[in-house]
Amino acid sequence: QAKQYLDANEAALQKYRELCRGMDCDFEEKTAYVYSLNDRRKIERELDALEKLGVPGEFTDRLPLPFPVAGAVRYPNQAQFHPLKWIAAISKSLHICEHTPVRELVGTTAITDYGKVTANKIIVATHFPFLNKHGSFFAKLYQHRSYVIALENAPNVDGMYVDEAQTGMSFRNYKNLLLVGGGDHRTGKQGGAWQELRDFAQRHYPKAAETSHWATQDCMSLDGVPYIGPYSASTSDLYVATGF
C-alpha cells in the first residue's frame, strides 16, 4: 500500500509538470525536507522505508533554518506552484458554472436550482463531500486548521521544509518572501495562532517584515491518507477526492 501511495503521488507530480508546461503559474522544481527537532531515529526509519521502496532520499542534519535539527530526510525533484494562477490558467479551457449549488445527486445527474446536469462520471471535490447518504465521510474526516505568515527581508531557504511533528513548523520561499507556517490544531480549539508565528519571526528574523497572513482549513482523513476514488461501493461512476 505504501508503494501504491508513493507511485500515485509520483504520477500526480509528473502530470502537474506536464500541465504546468508553458503555463504562468510559477512552477518551480524544489527539494523537499522532512525534519525532526529531537528524534533522529524517526528520520532514520523513514530513510529505511524509502530505501525498501527504491526511492532516492538522503539524510542531513544541516538545514538553513534558525534552529538545530536532529536530522532530516532530503527528497530531491519535488515542486511547488501558485495554485490560484494555475486555476486561472487551466480554467480557460473549462466550462464553469458559478453560483450554481448542487442540491442532490441522482446517479450521475446533478440537480441544481436552475436545471439538471448529466455526465458519464461525476467527481465530488467539494472540500467536504456533501452527499451524506453514501460513503459516511462525516465519520471519517476531521477539520484541521493551520496558519501562515509571509515575511519580506528574510532568508532564502532554497527548498520546502516541514516538521515531522504535526505541531511543528514549515518553511518555503515564494519569490522574495519567506512563508512560515505552523500553529496547527483541530477546529474547536482556540485559534488565531498567527501571534505564535510573529513571535517566532521576531526572535529569529528580527529584520524581516510581515506582508500578509492567512489560515487554511482542511478536511483530513483519520490516517492521513486522502480519500480519492469511488465515492462508495454502491455508487457507480461517482468519485470523491477529499482528505488533503
Model region roles, listed by residue range:
Residues 19, 41-51, 70-121, 125:
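Helical element adjacent to the flavin cofactor pocket in flavoenzyme catalytic cores
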Residues 24-34, 59-89, 183-184:
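Helix-loop-beta segment of a Rossmann-like dinucleotide-binding subdomain
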Residues 29, 61, 98-100, 104-106, ...:
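Short loop/edge segments at beta-strand edges and connector loops
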